[in-house]
Swiss-Prot record:
UniProt keywords, alphabetically: Cell adhesion, Cell membrane, Coiled coil, Disulfide bond, Glycoprotein, Immunity, Inflammatory response, Lectin, Lipoprotein, Membrane, Palmitate, Receptor, Repeat, Secreted, Signal-anchor, Transmembrane, Transmembrane helix
Membrane-topology annotation of the record: Lipid-anchor; Single-pass type II membrane protein
Subunit structure: Homodimer; disulfide-linked. May form a hexamer composed of 3 homodimers. Interacts with HSP70.
Disulfide bond entries: C235-C246, C262-C354, C333-C346
UniProt lineage: Eukaryota, Metazoa, Chordata, Craniata, Vertebrata
Lipid attachment residues per UniProt (S-palmitoyl cysteine): C45
Function: Receptor that mediates the recognition, internalization and degradation of oxidatively modified low density lipoprotein (oxLDL) by vascular endothelial cells. OxLDL is a marker of atherosclerosis that induces vascular endothelial cell activation and dysfunction, resulting in pro-inflammatory responses, pro-oxidative conditions and apoptosis.
Location of region: Disordered: 1-22
Subcellular location: Cell membrane; Membrane raft; Secreted
Species name: Mus musculus (Mouse)
Keyword Membrane on entry: yes
GO cellular component terms given for this protein: extracellular region; extrinsic component of plasma membrane; membrane raft; receptor complex
GO MF term set: carbohydrate binding; low-density lipoprotein particle receptor activity
Protein name per Swiss-Prot or TrEMBL: Oxidized low-density lipoprotein receptor 1
Length: 363
């Protein structure tokens, strides 16, 4: 045995133990069942892959649906939160509105009570006015009947005068014709006829003048009858009538503002000239305790009390009470209340009584 032979690897030598035996791997490949098993395994892998793909796709769809559902929930939460805020705001607004409405109700209730009181006063004034209008209506009807009788009489006289004038005109015409026929007659006859013509002409002129006067009287009476038909009474609407004066209760304003209002209505603040006037006014305001300015004032303490027209106060009818000794820049002004006359600062607010002369029907 050479050195090279000794150096050969031991595995080059045949394995005695493996002689006569086939390898196990080769034995499996040579088995008739390995191909169907492999195909089955491949199919299972494909099915599993497809299933995984489908499941993954469905999972993505479910994930998208969950995201959309989450977004919808978020949106609904925002909407719900907005609704809750709006409801809270509405409740707060409702509370404020309730408070505001309650305040308005209280104010309206107070105004309603004031209006009810004013309505009672207006009802009394309306009753007094209706009585005054009834008296004026009775007076107006009598005046109209009287005027109608006068107009009928004048119209009848006018017709008579017109008839007389026509007769005179006819006589003049006849005389002129006779004068024309007698133009060739004697001068004496002409003078006689001319004298008669002059006399008749003079009478005609007198009758014409009387007729014009009657026409003017007729026109004046017709105008008076028209005024009587339109005459609603000696006092304007809402004014009270007492003897020769009309009275209006209005306000409330300061003394100066009431004075200006009375002047704009053609009158002045109340001036009491007699006990009868004072009794009427006190009776007219006996249903209320409100103060009423009258046209009596003075500039400074110690100076005389003067009416609006400058005449001094006659203490025979009444005296002022509760006169303040304090000096006001606007002076002291008098007012009626509870049947007495008081004096106070002229800038205070009170009702007033306007006064003006009655407007009698002129015939």
């Amino acid at each position: 045995m050479t050195f090279d032979d000794k150096m050969k690897p031991a595995n080059d030598e045949p394995d005695q133990k493996s002689c006569g035996k086939k390898p196990k791997g080769l034995h499996l490949l040579s088995s008739p069942w390995w191909f169907p098993a492999a195909m089955t395994l491949v199919i299972l892998c494909l099915v599993l892959s497809v299933t995984l793909i489908v499941q993954w796709t469905q999972l993505r769809q479910v994930s998208d649906l969950l995201k959309q559902y989450q977004a919808n929930l978020t949106q609904q939460d925002r909407i719900l939160e907005g609704q809750m805020l709006a409801q809270q705001k509405a409740e707060n607004t409702s509370q404020e509105s309730k408070k505001e409405l309650k305040g308005k109700i209280d104010t309206l209730t107070q105004k309603l009570n004031e209006k009810s009181k004013e309505q009672e006063e207006l009802l009394q004034k309306n009753q007094n006015l209706q009585e005054a209008l009834q008296r004026a209506a009775n007076s107006s009807e009598e005046s109209q009947r009287e005027l109608k009788g006068k107009i009928d009489t004048i119209t009848r006289k006018l017709d008579e005068k017109s008839k007389e004038q026509e007769e005179l005109l006819q006589m003049i015409q006849n005389l002129q014709e006779a004068l024309q026929r007698a133009a060739n007659s004697s001068e004496e006859s002409q003078r006689e006829l001319k004298g008669k013509i002059d006399t008749l002409t003079l009478k005609l002129n007198e009758k014409s003048k009387e007729q014009e006067e009657l026409l003017q009287k007729n026109q004046n009476l017709q105008e008076a009858l028209q005024r009587a038909a339109n005459f609603s009474g000696p006092c304007p609407q809402d004014w009270l009538w007492h003897k020769e004066n009309c009275y209006l209760f209005h306000g409330p304003f300061s003394w100066e503002k009431n004075r200006q209002t009375c002047q704009s209505l053609g009158g002045q603040l109340l001036q009491i000239n007699g006990a009868d006037d004072l009794t009427f006014i006190l009776q007219a305001i006996s249903h209320t305790t409100s103060p009423f300015w009258i046209g009596l004032h003075r500039k400074k303490p110690g100076q005389p009390w003067l009416w609006e027209n400058g005449t001094p106060l006659n203490f025979q009818f009444f005296k002022t009470r509760g006169v303040s000794l304090q000096l006001y820049s606007s002076g002291n002004c008098a007012y009626l209340q509870d049947g007495a006359v008081f004096a106070e600062n002229c800038i205070l607010i009170a009702f007033s009584i306007c006064q003006k002369k009655t407007n009698h029907l002129q015939i």
